[in-house]
């Protein structure tokens, strides 16, 4: 049995706004959190494989990035300041068409490095060559929900379905259970009804959920209404998509009925505020969705449209954007923003029984943040300091599935210099430089 004790930290369990243990300790045994309490309260506290002294730090659940395209780190800064469809058709898709399996592996390795160093322990990914994405996840020690993005109008549509099924068979539940799989028809505007039906049948066959972009732009909203006589959400509802667990990314352009459907039927909505701002897609009505009872997590989207994977930045931007768009400073307060970036993100991906909280019986995905920094002083409100003042360099240590993957800012599972060298070389080749 492997026993890891984290001692002396203030523990933000995310079980409630007041569920904070000052100078506490938590014990992780064989990947499971088995004890959370006051110092010295863990049984056999002298018989540990590893002890982390965490005085002056906060222990909290790792951040959960509900929606990204990890390998797109290769495209960071390649194409900016363009409308979504121009950006995709003229820049992103041609670049991606030149990418090899190894390019995708190394791009994902860089994404995992960036996420670990900014406190993300789990992410939801939609992309191509997912075997290579899974290899990177397995090597780095991260947790991930992976899905092979499928474009139903592309010549590769049938091949993508085969690869999606191979991903499910080969990787669902692998890497000691850290990898789970969903089925990912790209979006209603790229997947006709007959193709969506094939995707739903595949998901039902393997008891998987659906991961899909939905109602991201006004163009999509209007085009789907013109083509099918319904909004994108109602179109998918009529097709029966929401009979399966659905993680819907973006959900920017919604009417009242759409919001009711998502609140009642979707497993979760992935809110991507910075990508939506950068691409001028609009502002998702998240405050209203939450009021209706929807489960909303936070995603960064890919680095080509953000341009980083920093969940602290994302949750802060997401909170502030809702405040100003509703002209109500009380919507999405600090604790709610942290919930969206942790336990609500886990629920969105069907992982709420495993991660997102620090409590006995959950897997040991924990981060330690340094609170002894000028921008974290004074401490009138710990939760507000984390949500509104902390930055990614405050993340000192990252534990995933009970294993220490970063200790005192040193990532133990990744050769940082090699990863950045590989990405620089490959990005230059792909860009034709």
UniProtKB/Swiss-Prot annotation:
Cofactors (names): Zn(2+)
Keywords linked to the UniProt accession: Hydrolase, Metal-binding, Zinc
InterPro entries: Amidohydro-rel, Deaminase_MtaD/DadD, Metal-dep_hydrolase_composite, Metal_Hydrolase, MTA/SAH_deaminase
Single GO MF descriptor: 5'-methylthioadenosine deaminase activity
EC annotation from Swiss-Prot or TrEMBL: 3.5.4.28, 3.5.4.31
Co-factor binding details: Binds 1 zinc ion per subunit.
Catalytic activity: S-adenosyl-L-homocysteine + H2O + H(+) = S-inosyl-L-homocysteine + NH4(+); S-methyl-5'-thioadenosine + H2O + H(+) = S-methyl-5'-thioinosine + NH4(+)
SUPFAM superfamilies per UniProt: Composite domain of metallo-dependent hydrolases, Metallo-dependent hydrolases
Binding site for Zn(2+): 67, 69, 213, 301
Similarity annotation: Belongs to the metallo-dependent hydrolases superfamily. MTA/SAH deaminase family.
Function in brief: Catalyzes the deamination of 5-methylthioadenosine and S-adenosyl-L-homocysteine into 5-methylthioinosine and S-inosyl-L-homocysteine, respectively. Is also able to deaminate adenosine.
Name the record gives this protein: 5-methylthioadenosine/S-adenosylhomocysteine deaminase
Species of the source: Desulforamulus reducens (strain ATCC BAA-1160 / DSM 100696 / MI-1) (Desulfotomaculum reducens)
Source species taxonomy: Bacteria, Bacillati, Bacillota, Clostridia, Eubacteriales
Gene name for this UniProt entry: mtaD
């Amino acid at each position: 049995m492997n026993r890891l004790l984290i001692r002396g930290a203030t523990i933000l369990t995310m079980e409630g706004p007041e569920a904070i243990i000052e100078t506490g300790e938590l014990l992780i045994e064989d990947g499971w959190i088995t004890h959370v309490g006051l110092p010295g309260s863990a049984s056999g506290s002298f018989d540990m494989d590893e002890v982390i002294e965490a005085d002056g730090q906060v222990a909290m659940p790792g951040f959960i990035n509900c929606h990204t395209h990890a390998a797109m780190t290769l495209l960071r800064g390649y194409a900016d300041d363009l409308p979504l469809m121009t950006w995709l058709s003229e820049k992103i898709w041609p670049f991606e068409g030149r990418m090899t399996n190894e390019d995708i592996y190394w791009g994902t390795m860089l994404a995992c490095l960036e996420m670990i160093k900014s406190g993300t322990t789990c992410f939801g990914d939609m992309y191509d060559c997912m075997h290579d994405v899974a290899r990177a996840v397995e090597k780095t020690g991260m947790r991930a929900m992976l899905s092979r993005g499928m474009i139903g109008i592309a010549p590769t549509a049938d091949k993508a379905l085969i690869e999606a099924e191979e991903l499910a068979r080969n990787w669902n539940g692998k890497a000691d259970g850290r990898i789970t799989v969903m089925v990912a028809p790209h979006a209603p505007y790229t997947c006709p009804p007959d193709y969506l039906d094939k995707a739903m049948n595949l998901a039902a066959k393997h008891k998987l959920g659906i991961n899909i972009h939905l109602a991201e732009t006004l163009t999509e909203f209007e085009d789907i209404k013109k083509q099918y006589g319904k909004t994108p959400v109602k179109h998918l509802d009529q097709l029966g998509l929401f009979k399966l667990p659905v993680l819907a990314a973006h959900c920017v352009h919604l009417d009242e009925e759409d919001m009711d459907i998502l609140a009642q039927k979707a497993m979760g909505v992935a809110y991507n505020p910075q990508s939506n701002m950068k691409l001028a897609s609009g502002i998702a009505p998240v405050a209203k969705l939450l009021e209706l009872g929807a489960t909303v997590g936070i995603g960064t989207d890919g680095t080509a449209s953000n341009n980083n994977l920093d969940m602290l930045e994302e949750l802060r931007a997401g909170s502030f954007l809702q405040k100003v768009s509703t002209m109500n400073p009380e919507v999405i307060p600090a604790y709610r923003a942290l919930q969206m970036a942790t336990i609500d993100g886990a629920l969105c991906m069907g992982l709420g029984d495993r991660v997102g909280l620090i409590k006995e019986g959950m897997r040991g995905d924990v981060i330690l943040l340094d609170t002894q920094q000028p921008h974290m002083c004074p401490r009138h409100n710990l939760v507000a300091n984390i949500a509104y003042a902390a930055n990614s360099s405050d993340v000192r240590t990252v534990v995933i599935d009970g294993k220490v993957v970063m200790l005192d800012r040193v990532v133990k599972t990744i050769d940082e210099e090699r990863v950045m060298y590989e990405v620089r070389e490959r990005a230059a080749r792909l860009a034709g430089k």
